[in-house]
Regions:
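A polyanion-binding, active-site-adjacent surface
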Residues: 1-165
């Protein structure tokens, strides 16, 4: 890891505490932003640099293309994830490899300790907030897992503010 991104004390008790790598804090926290963008979780590159959707990571390159197509800059979004540490799929010779989807217990812990307080602090806890969920885990987490992904793709959903605090 090239950045001091050790897990804070509030991560203790998380089912992924001993498995997860690094700790990736939100980008543009404390800055005025137009929308929040929430992904599944950091990958290896993001964990190494402590930056969500790092521009040199596959997901970061995709996000850069999306934002460019929408004529938006990274600075216009609060960029974060539903889990804030990298969840490697396996370990080979002690080295983490790949990515795995977070469990519901990991999502619940990270949301209650990190994401939900962040959204409230940044003003994204009301029904007029604009939040973009990227991927199935983030979408399921924010919509309480109701329905299939096809129901949500390319659409806007109203999420009760009580589900965001």
């Amino acid at each position: 890891m090239t950045k001091d991104n050790a897990k804070p004390m509030r991560c203790e008790g998380c089912p992924a505490y001993d498995w997860g790598e690094g700790f990736v804090t939100p980008e543009n926290q404390g800055q005025p932003t137009k929308f929040a963008l929430i992904g599944q979780g950091p990958g290896e590159v993001e964990a190494r640099y402590g930056r969500p959707f790092h521009p040199s990571a596959p997901a970061g390159r995709t996000l850069s293309r999306w934002l460019s197509a929408a004529e938006l800059g990274r600075e216009e979004a609060l960029i974060t994830n539903i889990v804030w540490c990298w969840l490697p799929a396996t370990r080979t010779n002690g080295l983490p490899k790949g990515n795995r989807e977070p469990t519901q217990a990991e999502i619940t812990h990270c949301r209650s300790r990190h994401l939900d307080p962040l959204l409230k602090e940044e003003g994204y806890h009301n029904e007029s907030s604009f939040i973009v969920a990227v991927g199935a885990p983030a979408t399921r987490s924010l919509t309480k897992g109701e329905g299939s992904m096809e129901r949500y793709m390319g659409s806007m959903q109203r999420i009760p503010s009580s589900d965001l605090t």
